[in-house]
Amino acid sequence: MTIRIGTGVDVHPLEVNVPMHLGCIAWPNEPAGCSGHSDGDVLAHATCDALLAAAGLGDLGEVFGTADPQWANASGSALLTHVLQLLSANGWKIINVSAQVIANSPKIGTRRAEIQQAMSSALGGAPVS
């Protein structure tokens, strides 16, 4: 069995009155969210980027380019599920995902398990920490 590890990073500008999505869940009490072509879920996007890199299948921009209207306003979970399908079609299996969020807000501690469950569900049950 071949095991590969990928690293992904994603950055979006914060904008007031834009809904915050992080880790495939909504954060309705946040005053600002990440703007972008899709839902701006930087955690889901960085995870997609890492998985694509590990499998040698390109990067987030190649697979979900902003010129493709199919991905306009797409959720982080939709992107993760599509990446899972791409990986599976190319003979790859996700063993686990480990991700870090570097931000002052939102405070994810109380919703960590919810994020892990939502992302794991989008990735076909692969463990997420």
Protein language model features and the residues they cover:
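RNase III-family endoribonuclease catalytic core
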Residues: T2-L123
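Short, intrinsically disordered, charge-balanced linker/junction segments flanking boundaries
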Residues: A126-S129
